[in-house]
Structure formats: C-alpha cells, structure tokens
Amino acid sequence: MTLKTRYKETIRPKLLKDLGLKNIHQVPKVIKVNVNRGLGEAASNSKALEASLNEMATITGQKALVTRSKKAIAGFKIREGMAIGCTVTLRGDRMYSFLERFINLALPRIRDFRGVNPKSFDGRGNYTLGVKEQLIFPEISFDKIDSIRGMDITIVTSASNDQEGKALLKELGMPFSN
C-alpha cells in the first residue's frame, strides 16, 4: 500500500477522530515538500552546481531549479544573479513517493540515527530538517559523487499548529526522538 492510499484510507479517519475534528476536510494533509541545497562553492566551481542538479533530480525524480543570488556580497565573492544553489518543490504523487522513500529508506541509513528532532516545527505545522550527506538516499552511489553535500527538507502541511502537524507526520511514519 502506497503512502498516499494509506493516508486516505487509514491515517485521515484516525486523525479525524484523534484530533476531534468535525469534517474530513479539516484533517491536516501534506501540501508540498521542498528540497533545498545551498551551494556557496558554486560561485567558483561550476561543476559542483551541475553535479548537485543531477543528484537532486536523481533523488527527487524531478528537475531542480537553480537559485540565484539577489544581491552581490563581496565577503562571499558572489555577484548578483550568480547561481548559488538549487531547489525542488514536490507535490502530488511525487511528493508521497519521496516521503515514503525518505522515511522508510533514507532516514534509517543515517549513522547513529535516534529519530528526528520533534522541536523543528515552525509554529504553523510545517517541519524542516537538515540532512548532512546525500549518501543516505539509495539512488546515490558513493563512486559517482565528487563531494559530500547536505540539503534541507521542508514538509509543508495544512495543519494550523504544531500539535496537528506532529500528529500527521507521526502517523505517516516519521520517527521522532523523545
């Protein structure tokens, strides 16, 4: 059973009852997942950006968007409009597919993993976590990477507060630490 069908058939009715909501449309759901990677080294190394774009496309199954600097910062040696990162916004079936692979395959592969931090909510039910290396994803092989880079993953939900967001992610299988 995929994560999407599990959400519709078992998680949504359970959350409706647990959160004491009156309507099925009030139940929180995952709206989108943003996967972002900042690449300060892309200013001097154009191959880093290209490799990063390919990795993001492999991990998410969707082409990454190049993020560019809004203004020049001399201390960081960047000019306005320089490529300094890449981002992917996942929605729909790709989002559920990525979440399922991330929760069930990637997170358990983190060294000394004891669960994700339950305090990383933003106050509006959205959850953000950082990943230190891309090797936790089974699609990335150690031989094909040039350097280890991390990424930020933001899960945007329709929850109105952190308690609803945490209940949703816990039901989806997110392993929170105590």
Swiss-Prot record:
An annotated GO BP: translation
Keywords, in A-Z order: Ribonucleoprotein, Ribosomal protein, RNA-binding, rRNA-binding, tRNA-binding
Molecular function per GO: rRNA binding; structural constituent of ribosome; tRNA binding
Entry keyword annotation includes rRNA-binding: yes
UniProt subunit comment: Part of the 50S ribosomal subunit; part of the 5S rRNA/L5/L18/L25 subcomplex. Contacts the 5S rRNA and the P site tRNA. Forms a bridge to the 30S subunit in the 70S ribosome.
The family this protein is said to belong to: Belongs to the universal ribosomal protein uL5 family.
PANTHER family (UniProt xref): 60S RIBOSOMAL PROTEIN L11-RELATED
HAMAP family in alphabetical order: Ribosomal_uL5_B
Protein name: Large ribosomal subunit protein uL5
Gene that produces this protein: rplE
